[in-house]
Amino acid sequence: ELWHYSYPVSVKRNHGMSRTVPAVTDKFVVTIGPKLHVLCADALTGKPYWMIDLVKDYGATVPPWYAGQCPIIDGDRAIIAPGGSTLMIAVDCATGRVLWRTPNPKRWAMTHSSIVPVSMGSLKTYVYCASGGVVGVSATDGRMLWELPDWKVQIANIPTPVPVGQGRLFLSGGYNAGSMMVDVTSQGGAFSAREVYRLKPETFGSHQQTPMFYRGRIFGVIPDGRLVCMGLDGKHIWDSGTARFGLGPYVVADGKLYVLSDQGVLTIVDPNASKYTPLGQARILGGSDAWAPLAVAGGRMIARDLTKMVCIDLTGK
């Protein structure tokens, strides 16, 4: 252990407590705590720079099962979606000064989904699924560019929007939400968003994990536990048949699709094949709530369940 930092917060264990992934640069670490305390610390020493209480400062509502939103750092700014009085904020990482705020007149609440940067032509934007719909915000000044209230997920909206190119975004969720393809266009500086198609949950509906987009294909685990490979037209290319994976994470790295099951079994799949093609399999965890996102870097994978974290060598050396 190089350093640690903690602050007191009263919480009850409910499938664990830590659901958000810190944003890290060579200078800063930004975290969102279970009850919406945003902390920025020095990446080398752990020295805290600043903290923002989203509940106190913005009237944010703590989501069920506590915070699930992952902060992002874009350049020298932390981008956060509080909900309450303010839909989104940009914070200077060095000082904690709020650089811009996006008003939230409809009082859409924070969800477990996270913000994703999306370029719309030459304009950089941030897209976020709030409780009342999906929105696009200017990265320059926080101005609301478009909103689509047609997309709502009851109880818990968890997956992040997936940019698939040409102004389109793929949205997916659990609790019978299914999926939606959205097309965002602009004319004369005015943006608009429309539904291209909607899929029933049994066709494609990801409960917890954000679907993967790779080489024109969308990958995800649907409610019955099958891994599905789907084209941008919303039609299945293949599925995993009798193989089931549950609520665990998946990631594409080095041309392979890694899928972790609820039981802690890691399966390697060929994402380019015309049918479900597993390449290898190994149990790496005990499996209790093995739902946290997988992280891959330098030929290694970090995975965890409720009680254990492991680092796996993917190079075969």
Locations of regions flagged by a protein language model:
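WD40 beta-propeller blade core
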Residues: 1, 39, 89, 135-136, ...
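Short coil/turn segments that connect the beta-strands within blades of beta-propeller domains
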Residues: 26-27, 75-76, 122-124, 166-167, ...
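Short loop/turn segments immediately following the C-termini of beta-strands
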Residues: 34, 83, 131, 174, ...
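Short loop/turn segments immediately following beta-strands, especially the blade-tip
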Residues: 44, 179-191, 232, 268-275, ...
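Loop/turn-rich, solvent-exposed surfaces of beta-rich toroidal or solenoidal domains
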Residues: 177-179, 201-273
